[in-house]
Regions:
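Catalytic core segments in nucleotide and nucleic-acid processing enzymes
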Residues: 1-93
Length: 94
Protein backbone atom coordinates (compact mmCIF):
# COMPACT_ATOMS: atom_id res chain seq x y z
CA UNK A 1 0.00 0.00 0.00
CA UNK A 2 1.15 3.52 -0.75
CA UNK A 3 1.09 4.71 2.86
CA UNK A 4 3.47 1.98 4.01
CA UNK A 5 5.96 2.98 1.30
CA UNK A 6 5.74 6.68 2.17
CA UNK A 7 5.82 5.89 5.88
CA UNK A 8 9.04 3.86 5.55
CA UNK A 9 10.70 6.72 3.67
CA UNK A 10 9.57 9.34 6.20
CA UNK A 11 10.75 7.19 9.11
CA UNK A 12 14.12 6.83 7.39
CA UNK A 13 14.41 10.63 7.11
CA UNK A 14 13.28 10.99 10.71
CA UNK A 15 15.93 8.54 11.93
CA UNK A 16 18.61 10.34 9.93
CA UNK A 17 17.62 13.66 11.49
CA UNK A 18 17.64 12.16 14.99
CA UNK A 19 21.12 10.70 14.41
CA UNK A 20 22.25 14.24 13.61
CA UNK A 21 20.75 15.56 16.86
CA UNK A 22 17.88 17.31 15.09
CA UNK A 23 14.48 17.37 16.73
CA UNK A 24 11.45 16.82 14.52
CA UNK A 25 8.34 18.56 15.81
CA UNK A 26 6.02 17.83 12.90
CA UNK A 27 6.16 16.14 9.53
CA UNK A 28 4.10 17.81 6.81
CA UNK A 29 3.42 15.70 3.76
CA UNK A 30 2.37 17.76 0.73
CA UNK A 31 0.72 16.12 -2.29
CA UNK A 32 -1.88 17.00 -4.93
CA UNK A 33 -4.46 14.92 -3.02
CA UNK A 34 -4.80 12.00 -0.60
CA UNK A 35 -7.03 8.94 -0.89
CA UNK A 36 -9.38 8.03 1.96
CA UNK A 37 -7.33 4.87 2.58
CA UNK A 38 -4.13 6.91 2.81
CA UNK A 39 -5.74 9.31 5.30
CA UNK A 40 -7.06 6.41 7.38
CA UNK A 41 -3.64 4.73 7.48
CA UNK A 42 -2.06 8.04 8.45
CA UNK A 43 -4.54 8.45 11.31
CA UNK A 44 -3.62 4.98 12.58
CA UNK A 45 0.12 5.70 12.60
CA UNK A 46 1.31 6.48 16.12
CA UNK A 47 5.05 6.70 15.44
CA UNK A 48 5.17 9.96 13.50
CA UNK A 49 3.61 13.34 14.12
CA UNK A 50 2.37 13.54 10.55
CA UNK A 51 -0.05 15.98 8.91
CA UNK A 52 -1.31 15.86 5.35
CA UNK A 53 -1.52 19.03 3.31
CA UNK A 54 -2.72 19.32 -0.27
CA UNK A 55 -0.67 21.53 -2.56
CA UNK A 56 -3.66 23.77 -3.30
CA UNK A 57 -4.31 24.24 0.43
CA UNK A 58 -0.65 25.10 1.02
CA UNK A 59 -0.81 27.71 -1.75
CA UNK A 60 -3.98 29.31 -0.35
CA UNK A 61 -2.60 29.37 3.20
CA UNK A 62 0.62 30.97 1.94
CA UNK A 63 -1.27 33.73 0.11
CA UNK A 64 -3.28 34.57 3.23
CA UNK A 65 -0.19 34.38 5.46
CA UNK A 66 1.64 36.94 3.26
CA UNK A 67 -1.09 39.50 3.98
CA UNK A 68 -1.55 38.59 7.65
CA UNK A 69 0.01 40.36 10.63
CA UNK A 70 2.12 37.31 11.52
CA UNK A 71 5.90 37.42 11.18
CA UNK A 72 6.17 33.70 11.97
CA UNK A 73 3.65 31.01 11.14
CA UNK A 74 1.72 29.85 14.23
CA UNK A 75 2.68 26.16 14.14
CA UNK A 76 -0.19 25.24 16.46
CA UNK A 77 -2.46 25.60 13.42
CA UNK A 78 -0.92 22.43 11.98
CA UNK A 79 -2.23 20.12 14.70
CA UNK A 80 -4.67 18.08 12.55
CA UNK A 81 -3.94 14.96 10.53
CA UNK A 82 -5.56 16.48 7.45
CA UNK A 83 -4.88 20.20 7.50
CA UNK A 84 -8.11 22.22 7.58
CA UNK A 85 -7.64 25.08 5.13
CA UNK A 86 -10.66 27.10 6.28
CA UNK A 87 -9.71 26.94 9.97
CA UNK A 88 -6.16 28.13 9.28
CA UNK A 89 -7.20 30.93 6.93
CA UNK A 90 -9.80 32.11 9.46
CA UNK A 91 -7.19 32.14 12.24
CA UNK A 92 -4.68 34.05 10.09
CA UNK A 93 -7.19 36.75 9.17
CA UNK A 94 -8.31 37.52 12.73
Amino acid sequence: NKFSTVSRQLKSYQNLALKNNLRIVKILLVAPEFSDDFIYDCEMDTEMNLSLLTASTLSKIFEVFKTSNYQEFPHVLFRDIVINEERIIKALTK
